[in-house]
């Protein structure tokens, strides 16, 4: 890990994707600078700001004021908060409002919110007028380190999570770390699961750094900025190597195959399970399943579980409130996973901490047996 920078600094992570290249700015005070940063990069002078009922009272006024100061006229679209907003109904509401605001191709849609708002707004930006400019202003840790970067957008289906969507890269990401101070402890912990994921994929030194410094990351300041920047750089590196998820980008789904199945099983009820919590449980399950398949040591799974438990994240299916459906139902959700190819199951498994890999054609019989063991 690099030395921790001063708390007042803003870090920039560049995502070099040719004509779709963009910057991720990370640090305090970026919402106040949003108008100037957008105006310096985009030609259009109109914006539709998509946000939710929780975020709007906190940050919408400040963002609109910043846009006004930069000469960018804006209209706001305020949607309900929560995972269930990722639906066709709310997507069409957003699209209609963007069109009502007469946003043209050189203008932009701005996502002001967490992963739900970012995913839905990006989908709207990708399909309105066959594509308008898009800016992410993520307000959750999970969105800052994961969903705002990389161009994946989408909504959920009754068949599973994120199954309907497009790739539409943002033109700019403004990760204002000040906004994280208003997150609940549960929301911050959920985002931290995605931070830990990058260490578990291929950066064992980063995972070890997190084990030693997680309390400082939770406290805020320089360690938090460093963790977010390292996470964004890790994701940017993978996205540049495989923008359309035809190969190594699938590694970013570590923990997500099991996690998405659990989210589907709980009907996206955030009172029971939020995305980062599903990823936390999923990462432990992925390491345990790898050990079961004699790919990794059980000690690695125990180490992952120990750290995630230490920060207060759920690590077992039994940690989810309420009853879960049987293993066979979970298996049905896994079979709908986006990584399935020609009906064959694909998982992100591991040979050790920071040694994740794409495992094709995983035997369904092994998975169902494992699920029955973990959820009898």
From Swiss-Prot:
HAMAP family: DHQ_synthase. One of its GO terms (cellular component) is cytoplasm. Belongs to the sugar phosphate cyclases superfamily. Dehydroquinate synthase family. It comes from Rhizobium leguminosarum bv. trifolii (strain WSM2304). Zn(2+) binds at residues 194, 256, 275. This is 3-dehydroquinate synthase. NAD(+) binds at residues 115-119, 139-140, 152, 161. It comes from the Bacteria. Its main location: cytoplasm. One of its GO terms (biological process) is chorismate biosynthetic process. It catalyses: 7-phospho-2-dehydro-3-deoxy-D-arabino-heptonate = 3-dehydroquinate + phosphate.
């Amino acid at each position: 890990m690099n030395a921790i920078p001063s708390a007042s600094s803003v870090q920039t992570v560049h995502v070099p994707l040719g004509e779709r290249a963009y910057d991720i700015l990370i640090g305090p005070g970026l919402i106040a600078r949003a108008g100037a940063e957008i105006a310096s990069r985009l030609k259009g002078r109109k914006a539709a700001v998509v946000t939710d009922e929780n975020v709007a009272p906190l940050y919408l006024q400040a963002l609109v004021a910043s846009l006004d100061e930069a000469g960018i006229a804006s209209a706001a679209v305020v949607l309900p908060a929560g995972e269930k907003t990722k639906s066709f109904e709310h997507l069409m509401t957003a699209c209609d409002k963007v069109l009502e605001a007469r946003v043209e191709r050189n203008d932009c849609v701005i996502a002001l919110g967490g992963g739900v708002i970012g995913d839905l707004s990006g989908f709207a930006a990708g399909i309105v007028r066959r594509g308008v400019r898009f800016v992410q202003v993520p307000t959750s840790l999970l969105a800052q380190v994961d969903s705002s970067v990389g161009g994946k957008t989408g909504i959920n289906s009754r068949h599973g999570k994120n199954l309907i969507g497009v790739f539409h890269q943002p033109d700019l990401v403004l990760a204002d770390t000040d906004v994280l101070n208003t997150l609940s402890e549960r929301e911050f912990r959920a985002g931290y699961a995605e931070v830990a994921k990058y260490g578990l994929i291929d950066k064992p030194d980063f995972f070890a750094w997190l084990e030693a410094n997680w309390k400082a990351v939770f406290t805020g300041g320089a360690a938090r900025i460093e963790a977010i920047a390292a996470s964004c750089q890790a994701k940017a590196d993978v996205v540049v190597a495989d923008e359309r998820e035809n190969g190594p980008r699938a590694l970013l789904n570590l923990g997500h195959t099991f996690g998405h199945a659990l989210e589907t099983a709980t009907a996206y009820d955030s009172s029971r399970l939020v995305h980062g919590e599903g990823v936390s449980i999923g990462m432990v399950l992925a390491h345990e399943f790898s050990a079961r398949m004699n790919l990794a040591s059980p000690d690695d799974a125990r180490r992952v579980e120990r750290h995630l438990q230490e920060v207060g994240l759920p690590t077992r299916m039994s940690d989810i409130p309420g009853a879960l459906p049987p293993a066979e139902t979970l298996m049905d959700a896994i079979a709908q996973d986006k990584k399935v190819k020609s009906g064959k199951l694909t998982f992100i498994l591991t040979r050790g901490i920071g040694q994740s890999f794409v495992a094709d054609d995983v035997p369904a019989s092994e998975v169902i047996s494992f699920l029955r063991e973990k959820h009898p």
